[in-house]
Amino acid sequence: MGSKSPNGEDRGPNGPSAKKAVASINPPKSAAASGLLRGALEDQDEDGDDDEGKIGADMNVSEKTANGTKKRRRNNKKKKSAQAAQQTAPPRVEIATLFHNRPYPEGEIVEYGINDENLVRTTDEEFRHLAVANNMNDEFLRDYRKAAEVHRQVRQYAQTIAKPGISMTELAREIEDGVRALVGHQGIETGDSLKAGMGFPTGLCINNVAAHWTPNPGAREVVLQHDDVLSIDFGVHVNGRIVDSAFTVAFNPMYDKLLTAVKAATNTGLKESGIDARMDYISETIQEVMESYEVMINGKPLPVKALSSLSGHNILRYKIHGDKQVPFVKTRTSQRMEEGDVFAIETFGSTGIGRTRDDVGVYGYSRNENVSTAGVHLASAKSLLKAIDENFGTLPFSRNYLERIGVKNYHLGMRSLIASGVVECYAPLVDTPGSYVAQFEHTVLLRPNCKEIISRGDDY
């Protein structure tokens, strides 16, 4: 989910360091980013032949005993192995069922550079610290890997249905229903969506819409066309640990270079991320890669521009945006990444002016926990705030989410909460009309001994 640059500026902040997210520090293992589970267990022995069937047949042969009576030997043929659970299409099998008694897959494990003296752990005290921390953060890592696997399985299905002719309402519903089914929390009962579910409303941004657009109840239906560029951005959380990842699809090959540029820029940001990595260096490197591409749109060459008004961001528990930012353009900032941080590394590339503005409409809302509720006096506002706190906390939510849990006649109360600053409202962000914007994003965990690109999959 894209983070707006503070105060509308085009560069990263020099703000204070964010609170450290809980560090996940299991020892590095081989990278294994899985997609949908495929196939079933095969009923074969190690050499691949079916010796067991022949043995069973022989064991069934009746033999005469010494007193002339017949004795039938027990058939020792093993029962066939049960088939491994498989995901459905659309995905509706809870992820805990698919991975019963098995660990969730790791993301892409990337070792830190061994030549970086700031990252080398050599002292006995440091090794003891790592050993203790390894035993303290299993839950953190398990939650993140579960959320990431849900994201992979849901987005793989979304890619099969995100085709010309589908409405954005249907696409958002399939994504969000899939997430809720796979985490095992429908979010209808009070507080259930805080256990696991959507990290924020599904973003479905077409053409010059860069970020923060989702279908709203009663709004005009939007249907995907062949010449559209569609960015799909959604988050999955388990116990408040949010995986934020996004990708872009296009059906006309003239947009291929745009998608390639943005994907390359995001991968550059991931490559340069790490403990003590400087935000200004990462930002400059991202822009250099992004803007080295050019795209031909209807016979006209256009440069790919990095959006200056959006940025990547760190993620805190139950808060999709922390107070650290990773811009996509050259910036001056003293911020660095730290051990234990969780970052959403994302980039947006545009054929427009490379800067967004607020459009009409509403994407969603979020609770501002730093603003006092003492000024909230309207009864409808108090009732709405209670529903928000009990069901969403500080997670962003949309009008659809409110209506889904049965909240009605909320508009007056919402206006009051926004006016008092207790709730923040997000508008869609757009570049110039006629331009095209693409986005790619991954979540990375900065563990002490490696970084784990937790949302990495076979698709991107």
Swiss-Prot record:
Binding sites annotated in the UniProt record for a divalent metal cation 2: D244, H313, E346, E441
Cofactor binding notes: Binds 2 divalent metal cations per subunit. Has a high-affinity and a low affinity metal-binding site. The true nature of the physiological cofactor is under debate. The enzyme is active with cobalt, zinc, manganese or divalent iron ions. Most likely, methionine aminopeptidases function as mononuclear Fe(2+)-metalloproteases under physiological conditions, and the catalytically relevant metal-binding site has been assigned to the histidine-containing high-affinity site.
Reactions catalysed: Release of N-terminal amino acids, preferentially methionine, from peptides and arylamides
Highest taxon of the lineage: Eukaryota
One GO cellular component term noted in the UniProt record for this chain: cytoplasm
TM region positions: none
Keywords: Aminopeptidase, Cytoplasm, Hydrolase, Metal-binding, Protease
Biased composition (Low complexity): 30-39
Composition skew (Basic residues), residue ranges: 69-81
Pfam family, one: Peptidase_M24
Binding site for a divalent metal cation 1: D233, D244, E441
Residues noted as binding substrate in the record, renumbered to the chain: H212, H321
GO biological processes: proteolysis
Segments forming a coiled coil: none
Family: Belongs to the peptidase M24A family. Methionine aminopeptidase eukaryotic type 2 subfamily.
Function summary: Cotranslationally removes the N-terminal methionine from nascent proteins. The N-terminal methionine is often cleaved when the second residue in the primary sequence is small and uncharged (Met-Ala-, Cys, Gly, Pro, Ser, Thr, or Val).
Protein name stated in the entry: Methionine aminopeptidase 2-1
